[in-house]
Amino acid sequence: MNPHAKLISIMSLALGTSITISSNHWILAWTGLEINTLAIIPLISKSHHPRAIEAAIKYFLTQSTASALILFSSMNNAWSTGQWDITQLNHPTSCLILTMAIAIKLGLVPFHFWFPEVLQGSSLITALLLSTLMKLPPMTLLLMTSQSLNPALLTLLAVSSALVGGWMGLNQTQTRKILAFSSISHLGWMIVIIIYNPKLTILTFIIYSLMTSTVFLSLSQIKVLKLSTMLISWTKTPMLNSTIMVTLLSLAGLPPLTGFMPKWLIIQELTKQEMTPVATTIAMLSLLGLFFYLRLAYHSTITLPPNSSNHMKLWRINTTPNTPTAILTVLSISLLPLSPLITTLV
């Protein structure tokens, strides 16, 4: 991809995200979402592979549909109440349409089918952007309107996402699809608490972004796209594979790693809100995700006997130190002792 085109796309992503998260008017927020959509499409299709082109088309169709629904929801609310302010979403039909639109944007169940396919057709770095940065604008809109939305509907979407994200990730062999279903499952945890404690949703999103960035950057460094390739990478980069294993366990939410903190706080908050059945259900559903995280961790640390490979130049792996990955790894596995301080700040 042309470096200038890549720079323009990245700058447009930053611009679109900034516009959406800082605006109070629906038209400005919609404009930022559209800039984001148009900026990420060249990054998805940069390899010119048929799968990448297909992923870009799927992404464009789903995101444009969701953006149209957001615009329709805001116009319907303005027609009924005379308000274009994002926080003044009071019309019930507008609230329902907006919930559906943001569910499509985020890839929540039952509007999740596009997300694994788009990630599978993208490079690892583009998949990282789709899993973290591109979730930020719709999540911001959801945070700003959460007090107007239906709690029962959001809880249903959250529990369904945790169930489907864990269940459909069990049988996957492609790392990008596994991480896509991981993202859907984590979104369920964020959505279930968004009405009762929005700051906890922000904390969960930040920690999820840290852990997911670590995994994607590490996989990109050792050029692993599927489990069978991960099996033969241990002998070449044992230290990096070890950090991937620990980060995956953190992503699964095992103590004493960082990923345990948001799940613990969410279950605690749900119990305070007298939603113990929901807390129990979503905690049990996280065991499904734990299975495929352990599967990934297991594949990252076992070795195969010497065998021939069809991959060209597989042994030529860049082993230069990667400072961002190292910093993200430390944050992804060691923040749990600081949880009292973090919760105080948030």
From Swiss-Prot:
GO molecular function, one term: NADH dehydrogenase (ubiquinone) activity
Organism superkingdom: Eukaryota
Protein family (similarity comment): Belongs to the complex I subunit 2 family.
Annotated membrane topology: Multi-pass membrane protein
Localisation per UniProt entry: Mitochondrion inner membrane
Alphabetically ordered keywords of this record: Electron transport, Membrane, Mitochondrion, Mitochondrion inner membrane, NAD, Respiratory chain, Translocase, Transmembrane, Transmembrane helix, Transport, Ubiquinone
Enzyme category, top tier: translocase
GO cellular component: mitochondrial inner membrane; respiratory chain complex I
GO biological process terms held by the UniProt record: mitochondrial electron transport, NADH to ubiquinone; mitochondrial respiratory chain complex I assembly; reactive oxygen species metabolic process
Protein name per Swiss-Prot or TrEMBL: NADH-ubiquinone oxidoreductase chain 2
Enzyme Commission code: 7.1.1.2
